[in-house]
Amino acid sequence: MVYSYSEKKRIRKDFGKRPRVLDIPYLLSIQLDSFKKFTDQDPTGERGFEAAFRSVFPIKSFSGNSELQYVSYKLGEPVFDVKECQIRGVTYSAPLRVKLRMVLYDREAAPGTVKDIKEQEVYMGDIPLMTDNGTFVINGTERVIVSQLHRSPGVFFDHDRGKTHSSGKVLYNARIIPYRGSWLDFEFDPKDALFVRIDRRRKLAASIILRALDYSTQDILDLFFDRVNFKIKKDSLVMDLVADRLRGETASYDIKDAEGTVLVEKGRRITARHIRQLEKTNTTELEVPVEYIAGKISGQDYIDPDTGEVLVSANADISLEDLAKLSMAGIKEISTLYINELDNGAYISDTLRIDSTTNRLEALVEIYRMMRPGEPPTKDAAEALFNNLFFSEERYDLSKVGRMKFNRRLSIDDDEGTGILSKEDIVAVMKNIIAIRNGFDEVDDIDHLGNRRIRSVGEMAENQFRVGLVRVERAVRERLSLGDLNELMPQDLINAKPISAAVKEFFGSSQLSQFMDQNNPLSEVTHKRRISALGPGGLTRERAGFEVRDVHPTHYGRLCPIETPEGPNIGLINSLSTFARTNNYGFLETPYRKVIDGVVTDEVDYLSAIEEGRYVIAQAIVQLDENGRMMDELIACRHKGDSTFMGAADIQYMDVSPQQIISVAASLIPFLEHDDANRALMGANMQRQAVPTLKADKPLVGTGIERTLAVDSGVVVAAKRGGYVDYVDASRIVVKVNEAELTPGEAGIDIYNLTKYTRSNQNTCINQRPCCSVGDPIVRGDVLADGPSTDLGDLALGQNMRIAFMPWNGYNFEDSILISERVAQEDRFTTIHIQELSCIARDTKLGSEEITADIPNVGESALSKLDESGIVYIGAEVKGGDILVGKVTPKGETQLTPEEKLLRAIFGEKASDVKDSSLRVPNSVKGTIIDVQVFTRDGVEKDKRAVEIEEMHIAQAKKDLTEEFQILEDGVIGRARNLLIGAGFDEAQLAAIPRSQLLVQTIDDEVKQTELEQLAEQAEELKADFDKKFEIKRRKITQGDDLAPGVLKIVKVYLAVKRTIQPGDKMAGRHGNKGVISKICPVEDMPYDEKGNPVDIVLNPLGVPSRMNIGQVLEVHMGAAAKGIGNRITEMLEEQRELAELRGYIKQVYELGDEVIQKVDIDSFTDDEILRLAKNLKGGVPIATPAFDGAKEKEIKQMLELAGLPQSGQLTLIDGRTGNEFERKVTVGYMYMLKLNHLVDDKMHARSTGSYSLVTQQPLGGKAQFGGQRFGEMEVWALEAYGAAYTLQEMLTVKSDDVNGRTQMYKNIVDGNHQMQPGMPESFNVLLKEIRSLGINIELDTK
């Protein structure tokens, strides 16, 4: 593999044995691609805005004299960029402008004669835009729209598993689910009649819907039944014989062939052998006794030719009397329905008998009564309702997916068709459910991923937009029908509010629009790749059973079987597998390598769950020879959802990668294959809760996906184009672009501005640090700057800690963790948390609130950190209770005496009518002010601090833009100099020419002269562009802010809190091994090895066997080896050994392992590159051991040997307190530990006195309310059991809800009198009141 300059800085040793056939696809593509499809112009009109507009427009007036037509749309540019929107608390959105055409028709002239056409561009609201990282900024906060897994539109057949009826009989049902519109259900009842339901309403006989579709009884019988024809003879009947139909029946007469030989005796069951005999004799007719027809069902109406009387009606049972009547009337042939209890039941016949309707109108009225109970039906209303239900494109849409699924399920060849139902569709569904009931077909598996599809952000936004458009359509249609249209323009007809409201509601408060989990880069990526079965149109937690939540065979390679939340949402919220993607229909598909005659090719096909069932698919771990041929005779594979073994020649596809089945979070766990699945689930989930540490540290033992994840998450800065680094500082990186990658006529400079110390959604700190130096060569995709939790472009969620598995004085009992003081001293787990505190000055009824330093009854010391505007200084160190923003609120006016009025007039004394409502630092918070933002309403005068901040921002913007302009101009001037040197100028001449004159020189060479003129134009454009950018920036900074109604000013203060690790904090490894820190132990007391190196953390060995997460032990061994090799390299560097020896050792490391695919050509590295690599490997050689394809035990031992460590991975440790050796060797090594966002500082809380509940007068609960600890029923029992009567009395009265008692006790304590008089608890009074509210008079007798 070829490594770029920056990749050579540190190379991860990879133990993967399988070649990478397919790179991991861009991890955020599910979000970005979906939204791109929504916003991009689509000429076909199948999706996005275009589809929504075309489905609603043209809007015609009721009279038909006018219509509003859609022409085109365009999305404008956003007013603010993403960062500005976050600071200002506004939505990152762009205005949608639509060109509409209003056409007026001439009433008097011929139909369709146009009288007038008006075209106009109309504003239709703001549409939130997606950022480059797949998020939305809504009201200043980053949100993610989670994709939804819902039931695909189409037709589904199912049964009730025998649960509906007490007999346990299985009742089948069918359901047609459209994308938009009413559901249509067919279901059998216990008596085997078929019923229909529309929108889950009251059920009707299924034949009613057929009658409504204009089928007569005769038509219905012809559709669903074959016929048996009889010729009427004098004493017998002759039946047309179809031999197959007799199978399973008991012969009620002797069955003879044409010669009269008895083939089946009377009373015998007719078997397949009898059928074969009958077929051999070519018997086509069979004479049967007259009694045979009794009870058969007539296939049509039989009418007396003379009188016109119906002798036997269709679907009636035929009796012997009926047969005599038919014979008398001269009818020679009759046909009956072919019904067989075994495989051809009389379901439709039975249904027709319970159907009270006889014609179409009656059926329509019956449907109308069911849908609109209580309304009087008319013919037109009933017809309109029925047509609108399933046959109107406005009200009903199966969608392309639904039609494809519908047609495939019913074996209709064409995958395309209309979005509405046809008569044939409904009949086909009924035939299919009858076939299932007869045993010829099977029900569907609704949990199969072929029956569930993904609805991503673009599709959901489009649906919401269409909802808004439909609301507008109603209003437009009414306006078109009213008033004089000659004066109106399209703008006057359209009100954009309903559209904006629908879109805003979706992005702001939909269940699937979630506050982005921004703990670390992994949590961001997994949130964007989350797939939820909940949400509108999905399941609910309460109704979801085990089957829906369970892992299904079709999840393979599509949804991760590991990563899902623990708790009520388990199985309902899933994560996309690493290589999965959605196809055009929204079904998940996963890639497979094609196998031809047992040889694996590099051709990759993406298969959906439906297609996958048709093929035989082998796993990625199959043994292949050098030509790609499968070596084993029998190969483990999957076919039709089952695991089996087949020969190599039968295999059609093979997995692309062993990591294919798991998600990104799960694939970050090394040695995942050695962990129990439940613990792996916890490990995957806990990595998302890791807080970014102050100093990121790459994992020594990783899986090789760390770099991909860090780059795709967008938290690092990756190079857009190749070149070399021209300038670096803490906030900006400038890259000079390679000539080959330039577009003609551009400056050739890429500027990357870095994000500094901003707050994330979870209050963690987002900060980017450059990781390149001036002069470094760069290729596209190289990491230029690290973000939070990244180290040289690798994801780094935690720290590598030296671990010992041993008990230590009970401090690691029950998963507790003992850590060394050194860990805290070195700030290994120190994290920065940034809190945003807001102070809002409102306009109240009594007057405006004011932000000021002049606060009543506050001492000088409390104001020491405020400036004259009453706002805290940046850099001030504050603690709980300190004032951050001084604010006074007007109090209600009190009646003043004339003397007071006079004094007030003279001295301007205002203190008495305002109260202090300043913003203070919350209790238990201590930190540093790092930023202050002031937002002032348009038209309100800005205070001094706001003006200062404004000026500072303008100066900063000017400085940034000037530097940017300077860099770009230098690029242009540099290219001009090169051009002039090429044209014959020498350095001395150029030095004499002023910089401004370089671009206006004349050259003899015409081509070069043209190039120089182009550069001069470019420089002019840059200058104009700079002025324009600066003016826009200045205007944005100085303009007033659009604040909520009644808000005059908002001050936002950002407070940075540094948190070191301490007892009570939660830590975890990556294998689900979590625990709470019990003690921080002095370094000298920690166990140490024979070389005197103490361990950092002591874990309990009992945490491993019962949890079956052995991966952590292997990680510790491999970590020890990786660190040991790093120590050997450090020694070599310190001892200044020969470079050849260092190169040889590093080469040994990278070449270690059997069948390892990674090839690192260390010999091709220059000496400088070897030294730089060695310096970066001092802390340990990073290892990649991919999931299901990782390092083997033998390789771990080889690594330990190379590091000079015992192959057992165990060392003799010495007790730091006694100096004695522990009696056994201890497993010591390096494990990657995470500090989780469950910090004791956020949970620690104590109450003295505080707020009380209004009704019960008991203290509130929870830290947020400054509440108390609940003393519940069981705690009362405990005190009763101890006989602690006085303590109990205290708990139930003065410490809880005895209002007078607690007030008195407070006074007594102040006075130094430690006595109490308990009174009546308020909750007893509440109980009395509640009993009285039931109408029971209850009096308390206090005698």
UniProtKB/Swiss-Prot annotation:
E.C. numbers: 2.7.7.6
Any one cellular-component term (Gene Ontology): DNA-directed RNA polymerase complex
Enzyme class, broadest EC rank: transferase
GO molecular function: DNA binding; DNA-directed RNA polymerase activity; ribonucleoside binding
Keyword Nucleotidyltransferase: yes
Keywords from the UniProt entry: DNA-directed RNA polymerase, Nucleotidyltransferase, Transcription, Transferase
Highest taxon of source: Bacteria
PROSITE patterns xrefs: RNA_POL_BETA
One BP term from GO: DNA-templated transcription
Membrane-spanning intervals of the chain: none
Reactions performed catalytically: RNA(n) + a ribonucleoside 5'-triphosphate = RNA(n+1) + diphosphate
Family matches, as InterPro entries: DNA-dir_RNA_pol_bsu_ext_1_sf (IPR042107), DNA-dir_RNA_pol_bsu_external_1 (IPR019462), DNA-dir_RNA_pol_su2 (IPR015712), DNA-dir_RNAP_su2_dom (IPR007120), DNA-dir_RNAP_su2_hyb_sf (IPR037033), RNA_pol_bsu_bac (IPR010243), RNA_pol_bsu_CS (IPR007121), RNA_pol_bsu_protrusion (IPR007644)
Keyword Methyltransferase: no
Subunit structure: The RNAP catalytic core consists of 2 alpha, 1 beta, 1 beta' and 1 omega subunit. When a sigma factor is associated with the core the holoenzyme is formed, which can initiate transcription.
Function: DNA-dependent RNA polymerase catalyzes the transcription of DNA into RNA using the four ribonucleoside triphosphates as substrates.
Family membership noted in the UniProt record: Belongs to the RNA polymerase beta chain family.
Protein name: DNA-directed RNA polymerase subunit beta
Organism listed in the record: Shewanella pealeana (strain ATCC 700345 / ANG-SQ1)
